[in-house]
Amino acid sequence: MAQDYYANKYGIQLEEFLIWGSEWDLKFWQYNFTTGQGFALTNALKYSVRAGKKPNEPFEKDMGKYNDYINMAVKMGFERVEAENWVALQKSIFEEFKGRKAELEELRKRKEMKENDEIRGF
C-alpha cells in the first residue's frame, strides 16, 4: 500500500497510522466495532485520504467509493453522520500524525523537561 497518495504531508503512510491506532484501540477499547464495521470504516477512510491524489483516478471516483463504504457501515448499524464523523476524525488525526518515531521523541522530550523542572524545584 506504500504509495504517495496514501501518505500525509509528513510522508507517513496510512498503514502506519492504522497500526498505531489499533494499538491504542486495544489499550482503551474506545471503539467497539465488528470486523465488518471496521472494514467498512477503514476503507471509507482510505478513499477519503487518497481522493484526488491517485494519478488517473478522479476525486469523484474515490469519493464515490468512500460513499459506498459509508453506506455499508450504515447497513451494519451506524448512523450515517456517526460513520462520517468517525472517518473525518481519523482523517484529521492522520493528517497531523508524524509517525511513531516522532511520537516517542516527543514523549522523551516531555519526560526530560519534567525531570529538569523537578531538579530546579518547579
Where are these predicted regions, by residue range?
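Intrinsically disordered, low-complexity regulatory regions
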Residues: 1-122
